[in-house]
Amino acid sequence: ITLKYMFLRSEEEYILTIKNATCAQHIFKCKRNSTECVQTNAGVVDNDYSFLRFGVWFMLNIVAVQKLTAAVHSSVIVCHDEAVMFLGESGTGKSTHTRLWRENIEGATLLNDDSPFIGVRDGRAVAYGSPWSGKTPCYKNENYPIRAIVRLSQAPHNKMRQLRSLQAIGALLPSLPPAFAFDEKLEDAVMNVLSAVVSKVPVYHLECLPDAAAAQLSHDTIFGV
């Protein structure tokens, strides 16, 4: 299914219009600085609920970034009561790596496998579960302080290094909602989220194989074992 949408903004209101192949149309609106978004055509008959899920996710992000919170395309593991967030392009191996944690690191569990939220609360960076978890049904209404964020890339070896602040922002930015780059105010809000998180959490780059040794390396580096 191909999602086709147009994102418009007036001075006071964001509008998201989604149309599917049969021209069923969903319209969502959110006022600037509001904490609510609404679907204006809730009576539309359409059995494809992916459009509703996408629209709610998109508009929720508009509300969230104004509160120093944003969705991140990532897979998040919880270990020792803290969250570790793994980023990467689709197909890089995020889900594989977090599965290796669960199989090889005692006490490691999955928080979300596709679109968790990150934010800053009471001076700490926090990862939140969400109803959007990709192909893995992991919908947890839980949150944990973030221990570290890791950008993954495939390699014929396992090697991990910590990134400097500017590199860290560059590692995170591609994993946040890309459409926000076309709206100056939303882009600024996203950068505020990234700056706040990076100032509180170490960000790493892990070049790795899809093996248990990679999971052990990232765990030991992050938790100082």
Where are the language model's segments positioned?
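Conserved lysine of the Walker
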Residues: 94
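Hydrophobic positions on the alpha1 helix immediately C-terminal to the Walker A/P-loop
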Residues: 97
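A noncatalytic interaction/capping subdomain that flanks phosphate/NTP-handling catalytic cores
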Residues: 1-90, 100-111, 116-225
